[in-house]
Amino acid sequence: MSVSAFNRRWAAVILEALTRHGVRHVCIAPGSRSTPLTLAAAENPAFIHHTHFDERGLGHLALGLAKVSQQPVAVIVTSGTAVANLYPALIEAGLTGEKLILLTADRPPELIDCGANQAIRQAGMFASHPSQTLSLPRPTQDIPARWLVSTIDNALAMLHAGALHINCPFAEPLYGDMNDTGLVWQQRLGDWWQDEKPWLREARRLASDKQRDWFFWRQKRGVVVAGRMSAEEGKKVAQWAQTLGWPLIGDVLSQTGQPLPCADLWLGNAKAVTELQQAQIVVQLGSSLTGKRLLQWQATCEPEEYWVIDNIEGRLDPAHHRGRRLVAKIADWLELHPAEKRKPWCVEIPRLAELAWQRVVAQRDTFGEAQLAHRIRDYLPEQGQLFVGNSLVVRLIDALSQLPAGYPVYSNRGASGIDGLLSTAAGVQRASAKSTLAIVGDLSALYDLNALALLRQVSAPFVLIVVNNNGGQIFSLLPTPQSKRERFYLMPQNVHFDHAAAMFNLRYHRPENWEELESALAGAWRTPATTVIELVVNDTDGAQTLQQLLAQVSHL
């Protein structure tokens, strides 16, 4: 009997089972213990393979692939701390709903807790963060193949959102030629190998329950808050709110076109807050809100009803309103709850939104990061997509820009970390094959610098704008101690990214004005390659511009 041959047959059943649940992308890191899984994936023609030497980046690459494909994405890593490096991406997926299937190779039980090399306690190591966890036994012919395939099917059928962690112990030897070991065991699955359906099919439909009193509430004064959603959903929500005559407060990730732009500015005006107090119902579609003033208003508003609609299960209202938590796909929910055409009830807010926009436009000629955030819609590739980093840049775009309705926008706004942003953006581009504009800060770029390796081969033009304000300038907006701010919060690194781009053979520009930036972008969109554009800006100008605009708009 060949242990290595049966390991591979066992792994082949696992990987083939994944294909029956829509898995097409498999992300693989190098490793020895994961050899059975890696070879099974490599030999299965249903998969598109992605490789990366850094497991943390690999997990985020899978996250980006899942964001766009809307299908589960598999990740294969070896044992030990390689597994732990998947934690950040796993946590993000749990908060934003992307489906990740983490196949983690492990030592067999007799090598755990006895001093064996690269052997850690992997079973359950992710605590409550995976949506589902499955610890498989060591491969043995004593367990029928139908148990293995049905167990995988059951776990995937139960996976509504987030990550499934499948821990896979394998004994040595891990290498060797294939022989007939386990062939009969494998063939007992019969014509399943030629089929395309799961062995075990479980029905689990996410149904949208119609709110029977909607006809009553849609005649009231309402407010629509749009959080993270798809581009198609964003367009539908915008039309729905317009028909109702309700003001729409659109997040940067809502893709609604933000018909009342600069919400994070005008929500700081007492007149706007006073008018919003007249709302009898607030309907929030999508979660993960960005704007600070929006979150402050959300925390203090007291409508008669506050509804939150999102296809992710669980509590998504940090203000704990009295109302309804409705688990449904946004498009399906809108179809069940049609709008009734009514005149807009808000008068002051549209006026304030227009005045706030004019204040922002008046400052657009200055070369800086706040102005870049405002101008970003002018630099979007045609029929492309935008990936927005975290920290200051996403807040500036949310507050100062107005993105086109239905234009795809992606970000990691679950745990909102700056780790893995370049890797996630790489996954977004690979899954869509669209021209992609990604914008991050300098610390975010440094944090995930080796992800530039993932950007060496792209299927469409990819532009990475690194806004270099020399540190974490988000802390300039916070009441951090002035004497400790630079050393312990901002942490300026005084670096540039030309050498990093050169190391990975990527095109590089450092424009010093808008004309040079636009020229660099024009050339980049004509070439199916990655271009790194570094915007070196004054350290605190972005934060100061936002604070100045907030003060101006608050007194309108």
UniProtKB/Swiss-Prot annotation:
<dbReference type="InterPro" id="IPR004433">
    <property type="entry name" value="MenaQ_synth_MenD"/>
</dbReference>
<keyword id="KW-0460">Magnesium</keyword>
<dbReference type="Pfam" id="PF02776">
    <property type="entry name" value="TPP_enzyme_N"/>
</dbReference>
<keyword id="KW-0464">Manganese</keyword>
<dbReference type="Pfam" id="PF16582">
    <property type="entry name" value="TPP_enzyme_M_2"/>
</dbReference>
<comment type="pathway">
    <text>Quinol/quinone metabolism; 1,4-dihydroxy-2-naphthoate biosynthesis; 1,4-dihydroxy-2-naphthoate from chorismate: step 2/7.</text>
</comment>
<dbReference type="InterPro" id="IPR029061">
    <property type="entry name" value="THDP-binding"/>
</dbReference>
<dbReference type="GO" id="GO:0070204">
    <property type="term" value="F:2-succinyl-5-enolpyruvyl-6-hydroxy-3-cyclohexene-1-carboxylic-acid synthase activity"/>
</dbReference>
<dbReference type="InterPro" id="IPR011766">
    <property type="entry name" value="TPP_enzyme_TPP-bd"/>
</dbReference>
<dbReference type="Pfam" id="PF02775">
    <property type="entry name" value="TPP_enzyme_C"/>
</dbReference>
<keyword id="KW-0474">Menaquinone biosynthesis</keyword>
<comment type="pathway">
    <text>Quinol/quinone metabolism; menaquinone biosynthesis.</text>
</comment>
<dbReference type="GO" id="GO:0030976">
    <property type="term" value="F:thiamine pyrophosphate binding"/>
</dbReference>
<keyword id="KW-0808">Transferase</keyword>
<comment type="function">
    <text>Catalyzes the thiamine diphosphate-dependent decarboxylation of 2-oxoglutarate and the subsequent addition of the resulting succinic semialdehyde-thiamine pyrophosphate anion to isochorismate to yield 2-succinyl-5-enolpyruvyl-6-hydroxy-3-cyclohexene-1-carboxylate (SEPHCHC).</text>
</comment>
<dbReference type="GO" id="GO:0009234">
    <property type="term" value="P:menaquinone biosynthetic process"/>
</dbReference>
<protein>
    <recommendedName>
        <fullName>2-succinyl-5-enolpyruvyl-6-hydroxy-3-cyclohexene-1-carboxylate synthase</fullName>
        <ecNumber>2.2.1.9</ecNumber>
    </recommendedName>
</protein>
<dbReference type="InterPro" id="IPR032264">
    <property type="entry name" value="MenD_middle"/>
</dbReference>
<keyword id="KW-0786">Thiamine pyrophosphate</keyword>
<dbReference type="GO" id="GO:0030145">
    <property type="term" value="F:manganese ion binding"/>
</dbReference>
<comment type="subunit">
    <text>Homodimer.</text>
</comment>
<keyword id="KW-0479">Metal-binding</keyword>
<dbReference type="InterPro" id="IPR012001">
    <property type="entry name" value="Thiamin_PyroP_enz_TPP-bd_dom"/>
</dbReference>
<dbReference type="GO" id="GO:0000287">
    <property type="term" value="F:magnesium ion binding"/>
</dbReference>
<comment type="similarity">
    <text>Belongs to the TPP enzyme family. MenD subfamily.</text>
</comment>
